Curated annotation (Swiss-Prot):
Its main location: cytoplasm. PROSITE patterns: AA_TRNA_LIGASE_I. One of its GO terms (biological process) is leucyl-tRNA aminoacylation. It catalyses: tRNA(Leu) + L-leucine + ATP = L-leucyl-tRNA(Leu) + AMP + diphosphate. InterPro entries: aa-tRNA-synth_I_CS, aa-tRNA-synth_Ia, Leu-tRNA-ligase, Leu_tRNA-synth_edit, M/V/L/I-tRNA-synth_anticd-bd, Methionyl/Leucyl_tRNA_Synth, Rossmann-like_a/b/a_fold, tRNAsynth_Ia_anticodon-bd. Its EC number is 6.1.1.4. It comes from Streptococcus agalactiae serotype Ia (strain ATCC 27591 / A909 / CDC SS700). The gene is leuS. GO terms for cellular component: cytosol. Belongs to the class-I aminoacyl-tRNA synthetase family. This is Leucine--tRNA ligase. GO terms for molecular function: aminoacyl-tRNA deacylase activity; ATP binding; leucine-tRNA ligase activity. ATP binds at residue 613.
Length: 833
């Protein structure tokens, strides 16, 4: 039986594409452009897993589709190669992270090429290449010049096991590090910060201009966390001290019965009484060991200590106790809150625990039983009584401003971006600290500041990076004899990935980040595909850098990525026992269609779960390509279900996709191809062209493949295949199965040219409509016959056909026809007696 020999055909076409630079980016300025971007991978030692090709196949199908539609297509690939994993591996094994990274990249590239992706490899970027990070450093110097990069002594998330501080976004909800799952503690350190807060409003507003999943926009909105409210100043009793709180509900000020400061608040030591000093000091120590996420966990028990001090509520002159509690963060708002326990759940729980007053100021609910958090008219609030929420807020803000004890205020949850890492394997920060106390950026003419090669990459132990040990590199002297020290912190992995999509546009430019005209030609990115796990970190950081570059006149657009698509996760086959615990696949046996634990004999249920080494359910694409072929993997991953759904891997599904490709191969290579069109496939062919064109454009790849299957089924029923339809069909399937597409194109045309730039097939609208139609014939209102007739017959023609039908004739034999009602394209009704 004829079948698709992937082991012969796929390497042949991969070599053809490479030798002929088939996918070199088009530069014809008269053509429309299409920029299809994948989130470039971190080249890990494990290589590609089957989750990577899902997104890559989607952008590849779009790229091949747009090339055929006459677009210049930019479809590049590169490597996000700095970062902790390579450094950890190097420390564990004694290998050089640069060598390890280069080996991993070579392996990733081999795997990617085996899958037939149409990348323009002339544009490959690598974040660890000095010719690349020269421009990462250049962007940093511009941030520094604009005052957007600054040094500060800040409490950081310190991970002892990693020897570095990490950003808030890299701390998991359980208070451990995203990388490695290590404990995170808070400690003050000198750090580089990027002033992303200066762009908070624009980062929020411009989300309206991009075509992104609403869920991702919401995650960014929540992370930026805009609140409109008021600052209120509280004086501390019997002192000259005061503190400010930010509240979104200034209208509830009459219900404020206590205040809470963050343990790190600058005022705490100054106002704490002698009686409370010991308890306060111990509480502060314990709070310093917890991450922000652990401290603000809503489910945890409320803890706190009274400072011994009282504040004066400005609106009614009442004395309220001042506490410290770790759920208030110094880094958020003003680091102090006014507590209104009657109308806030967290404040209510705290007040109940420490027996503090609860005074309702909104009508409704029973505040002895629970906080009332809905809206109601104001009570116990003097000049606000009887007002609704909006009116009361406006009136209270007016009162605060008139009395000089507060003002309207907009705040953001977003914090400045902690940008330094105390590690070796990252971009050196191009700053020199001079002994006269000044700091300067390394001039552009001296960039890149190259990361020095060293065998000793262990953290220094002092909180500085290993670069602090390299005296020759570290110490510099100015022309005037002033000595200086280079910055020893390096940039985080997020730096290189915040602008890589710009370098693809002009990757070999030695004079600038990229040529302005080329940036104008290609920006914004038309489609960006990657995992939803990057919703806040990478996507927010890249948008921030892009806006800075826009302000500098470097890029012509406000936003980098016009459309974003998050592919779903490919889940592995796994098994669950009666307790809900997952069982590794090597501990499972199949008997009579059921699954059992090898050791306990317990029957297990199949439950798809994230692929992991521990469950032994990771599928390596190399194995799939070897057994089934790259085209099978591509078609299967696109046919599994909607691209954004999470779906379980299935060997049966893979085999089904392989069988489909064999049927396609047989159809084109064994069916008689003819120049004569019988018309039998007119409708299904034109429907297929229309459906595949529309569905590829909408990224509904599974339904496009289903339509291709419909065509194959229909074509197999015919003795011959019209050559134009055979060619058109091969063009339609080529983006999904490009090796097969190229091979079958040669079978049909023997052109010696790639199918890649052959104009995409068009469809004939008139052929989409059936030329024949079924009508019913009724006698006395009951259906007696069904006729297939040409469309749009006249009443007379319909009537004649109906009366000539044998079934109808036998029904009306011997009866008088009173009248015949014929409705074109619908029915004929015969009235007899």
């Amino acid at each position: 039986m004829t079948f698709y020999n992937h082991k012969e055909i796929e390497p042949k076409w991969q070599a053809f594409w490479a030798d002929n630079h088939t996918f070199k980016t088009g530069t014809d300025a008269s053509k429309p452009k299409f920029y299809a971007l994948d989130m470039f991978p971190y080249p890990s030692g494990a290589g590609l897993h089957v989750g990577h090709p899902e997104g890559y196949t989607a952008t590849d199908i779009l790229s091949r589709f747009k090339r055929a539609q006459g677009h210049n297509v930019l479809h590049p690939m590169g490597w996000d190669a700095f970062g902790l994993p390579a450094e950890q591996y190097a420390m564990d094994t004694g290998n050089d992270p640069a060598e390890f990274t280069a080996e991993n990249i070579a392996n990733f590239k081999r795997q990617i090429n085996a899958l037939g992706f149409s990348y323009d490899w002339d544009r490959e970027v690598n974040t660890t290449d000095p010719n690349y990070y020269k421009w990462t450093q250049w962007i940093f110097t511009k941030l520094y010049e604009k005052g957007l990069a600054y040094e500060a002594e800040v409490p950081v998330n310190w991970v002892e096991e990693l020897g570095t501080a990490i950003a808030n976004e890299e701390v998991l909800p359980d208070g451990t590090s995203e990388r490695g799952g290590y404990p995170v503690v808070r400690k003050p350190m000198r750090q580089w910060m990027l002033k992303i807060t200066a762009y908070a409003e624009r980062l929020l507003e411009d989300l309206e201009e991009v075509d992104w999943p609403e869920s991702i926009k919401d995650m960014q909105r929540n992370w930026i966390g805009k609140s409109t409210g008021a600052n209120v100043t509280f004086k501390v009793k019997d002192t000259d001290k005061d503190f400010t709180v930010f509240t979104t509900r200034p209208d509830t000020l009459f219900g404020a019965t206590y205040a809470v400061l963050a343990p790190e608040h600058a005022l705490v030591d100054a106002i704490t009484t002698a009686d409370q000093a010991e308890a306060v000091a111990e509480y502060k120590r314990q709070a310093s060991l917890k991450s922000d996420l652990a401290r603000t966990d809503l489910a945890k028990e409320k803890t706190g200590v009274w400072t011994g001090a009282y504040a004066i509520n400005p609106v009614n002159g009442k004395e309220i106790p001042v506490w410290i509690a770790d759920y208030v963060l110094a880094s958020y708002g003003t680091g102090a809150i006014m507590a209104v326990p009657a109308h806030d759940e967290r404040d209510w729980e705290f007040a109940k625990q420490f027996k503090l007053d609860i005074i309702p100021v909104l009508e409704g609910g029973n505040v002895e039983e629970a906080a009332f958090t809905e809206d109601g008219l104001h009570i116990n609030s003097d000049f606000l009584d009887g007002l609704d929420k909006a009116s009361a807020i406006a009136k209270m803000v007016e009162w605060l401003e008139a009395e000089g004890v507060g003002n309207e205020k907009v705040t953001y949850r977003l914090r400045d971006w902690l940008f330094s890492r105390q590690r070796y394997w990252g971009e050196p920060i191009p700053i020199i600290h001079w002994e006269d106390g000044t700091s300067t950026a390394v001039p552009e003419s001296e960039l890149p500041l190259v990361l020095p090669v060293t065998k000793d990459i262990r953290p220094s132990g002092t909180g500085e990076s290993p670069l602090a040990n390299l005296t020759d590199w570290l110490e510099v002297t100015r022309e005037d004899g002033v000595k200086g020290r280079r910055e020893t912190n390096t940039m985080p992995q997020w730096a290189g990935s915040s602008w890589y999509y710009l370098r693809y546009i002009d990757p070999h430019n030695t004079e600038k980040l990229a040529d302005e005209e080329l940036l104008k030609q290609w920006l914004p990115v038309d489609i960006y595909v990657g995992g939803a796990e990057h919703a806040v970190l990478h996507l927010l950081y890249a948008r921030f850098w892009h806006k800075v570059l826009y302000d500098l006149g470097v890029v012509p657009t406000k936003e980098p990525f016009q459309k974003l698509f998050n592919q779903g996760m490919i889940l592995g086959t796994s098994y669950r026992d009666s307790r809900g615990a997952l069982v590794a696949t090597d501990k499972v046996e199949k008997r009579d269609g059921s699954f059992f634990h090898v050791e306990t004999g317990e029957e297990l249920e199949q439950a798809p779960a994230k692929m992991s080494k521990s469950l032994k359910n990771v599928v390596n694409p190399d194995d799939v390509v070897e057994q089934y072929g790259a085209d099978t993997l591509r078609v299967y991953e696109m046919f599994m279900g909607p691209l954004d759904a999470s779906i379980a891997w299935s060997e049966e599904g893979l085999e089904g996709s392989r069988k489909f490709l064999d049927r396609v191969y047989r159809l084109i290579t064994t069916k008689e191809i003819t120049k004569e069109n019988s018309g039998a496939l007119d409708k299904v062919y034109n429907e297929t062209v229309k459906a595949v064109t529309e569905q590829v454009d909408q990224m509904k790849f599974n339904t496009a493949i289903a339509q291709l299957m419909v065509f194959v089924n229909a074509a197999n029923k015919e003795d011959k295949l019209f050559s134009d339809y055979a060619k058109g069909f091969v063009q339609l399937i080529a983006p999904f199965a490009p090796h097969l597409g190229e091979e079958l194109w040669q079978v049909l045309t023997a052109s010696g040219e790639s199918i890649s730039y052959v104009p995409w097939p068009s469809y004939d609208e008139s052929k989409l409509v059936e030329n024949e139609i079924e009508i019913v014939v009724q006698i006395k209102g009951k259906v007696k016959a069904k006729l297939v007739v040409a469309k749009d017959l006249s009443r007379e023609e319909l009537q004649d056909l109906a009366l000539a039908n044998e079934k109808v004739q036998s029904e009306i034999a011997g009866k008088d026809i009173i009248k015949v009602i014929a409705v074109p394209n619908k029915l004929v009704n015969i009235v007899v007696k």
